[in-house]
From Swiss-Prot:
Protein name per the record: Homeobox protein knotted-1-like 3
Keywords, sorted A to Z: DNA-binding, Homeobox, Nucleus
Chain spans, region Disordered: 19-49, 272-291
GO biological process: regulation of DNA-templated transcription
UniProt KW Nucleus keyword: yes
Keyword DNA-binding: yes
Bias (Polar residues): 272-284
GO CC annotation, single: nucleus
């Protein structure tokens, strides 16, 4: 930053020190008496070097000589805060006070540096105070963390925290942030117990607050960042691939667990002769929660909640039970989707065979009439069959099958037919 009609960058250091020391003495001589009237406001046109060095030296003098006045100036919004034109609210007084102390400590060796170093320190201090005024919750935006790192390591810690906060703001302002968040939440939902899902929804409801905190940092940023675009695209693809791998992992291991449980049930049934459905603890349904609770109480009293072999409690917890129920539902859905086409084909085949085996009602009435008229000997000749084919429009095979089935259905209901057959057999 260049200031016209002021000191140049190459001003000798001894001249800078003498002139600022002269202004320092003039400022101490101009200090008003508390019992006297307030002095007249100083004229705005000051001699060289400039108002920047004067303001810095005034803050340094107030901090070292009179701590009470320094604290009052900080609380009233004076000092460096007014110098940087940062309007901090009353709730941020602690943060602004800490920032002013950090700024005053960092300007102690100011007389041993040139004019460009002074400008750099003011810029870093301004960024730190902006971060302190933006948020009190984020670890990257907390003024305490910035102050601690600056006091221990010079000024690099505050700059690093400030850069981390800006990187987060750039990610939140990126167009791919919503797909990134959705992919991340989808990975979290896999194999999560049903009773734990509301916690994820509650955290998603608070995401707007986080976006609002970092939105102030991303207002003046340039939107074209190829490195950030590539990072966002690759990370979204990575999360989507990770989601598929997690789903496959859960399904395979869940299927193995179900098959192992089925094998254990079969082995137990072969040893005891009792099916799992006949026992009192066959399932973990909601109707048996009371029985499970009573068994758990007895188990806790006898073994203090742990088994002697160190394998943990034998009775599943509520989270494990909800996870088992979710695995059952997912397996049921997968089986339906996998065998849906085969089930539909089998059902259509059964219905088609049923429709093919049934004759129309008008044709069966003709066949039944012939059956009633020839009840004593219900065996049509070839001529009778040819005439029935013409009357009904059926095939000869269908007529033969109908008479065979009809004789089977009425085998014992027609005594005359049975006597005729017996007489023929005797001959």
């Amino acid at each position: 930053m260049a200031y016209h009609n002021h000191l140049s960058q190459d001003l000798p250091l001894h001249h800078f020190t003498d002139q600022t020391h002269h202004q320092h003495q003039q400022y101490q001589s101009d200090q008003p008496d508390p019992n006297s009237k307030p002095p007249e406001p100083h004229h705005s046109f000051q001699p060289a070097p400039n108002w920047l060095n004067s303001a810095l030296l005034r803050n340094f003098t107030n901090t070292d000589t009179n701590p009470t006045n320094s604290n009052n100036a900080n609380n009233n919004g004076g000092g460096v805060s007014n110098f940087l034109n940062l309007h901090v609210t009353a709730s941020d007084s602690a943060a602004s006070q800490a920032s002013n102390q950090w700024l005053s400590q960092s300007h102690r060796p100011i007389l041993h540096r040139n004019h460009s170093d002074v400008n750099d320190d003011v810029t870093v201090a301004g960024d730190s105070m902006i971060a302190a005024a933006l948020s009190h919750d984020s670890a990257d935006l907390k003024p305490d963390s910035i102050l601690n790192k600056n006091e221990g390591g010079g000024g690099d810690g505050g700059v690093m925290n400030w850069q981390n906060a800006r990187h987060k703001a750039e990610i939140l302002a990126h167009p791919l942030y919503e797909p990134l968040l959705s992919a991340h939440v989808a990975c979290l939902r896999i194999a999560t117990p049903v009773d734990q899902l509301p916690r994820i929804d509650a955290q998603l409801a608070q995401s707007q607050n986080v976006v609002a905190k970092y939105s102030a940092l991303g207002n003046g940023m340039v939107g074209d960042d190829k490195e950030l675009d590539q990072f966002m695209r690759n990370y979204v693809l990575l999360l989507c691939s990770f989601k598929e791998q997690l789903q496959q992992h859960v399904r395979v291991h869940a299927m193995e667990a179900v098959m192992a449980c089925w094998e254990i049930e079969q082995s137990l049934q072969s040893l005891t002769g009792v099916s799992p459905g006949e026992g009192t603890s066959a399932t973990m349904s909601d109707d048996e929660d009371d029985q499970v609770d009573s068994d758990a109480n007895l188990f806790d009293e006898g073994m203090e909640g742990h088994d002697s072999m160190g394998f943990g409690p034998l009775i599943p917890t509520e989270s494990e039970r909800s996870l088992m129920e979710r695995v059952r539902q997912e397996l049921k859905h997968e089986l339906k989707q996998g065998y849906k086409e085969k089930i539909v084909d089998i059902r259509e085949e059964i219905l088609r065979k049923r429709r093919a085996g049934k004759l129309p009602g008008d044709t069966t009435s003709v066949l039944k009439a012939w059956w009633q008229s020839h009840s004593k000997w219900p065996y049509p000749t070839e001529e009778d069959k040819a005439r029935l084919v013409q009357e009904t429009g059926l095939q000869l095979k269908q007529i033969n099958n109908w008479f065979i089935n009809q004789r089977k259905r009425n085998w014992h209901s027609n005594p005359s037919t049975s006597t005729v057959l017996k007489s023929k057999r005797k001959r």
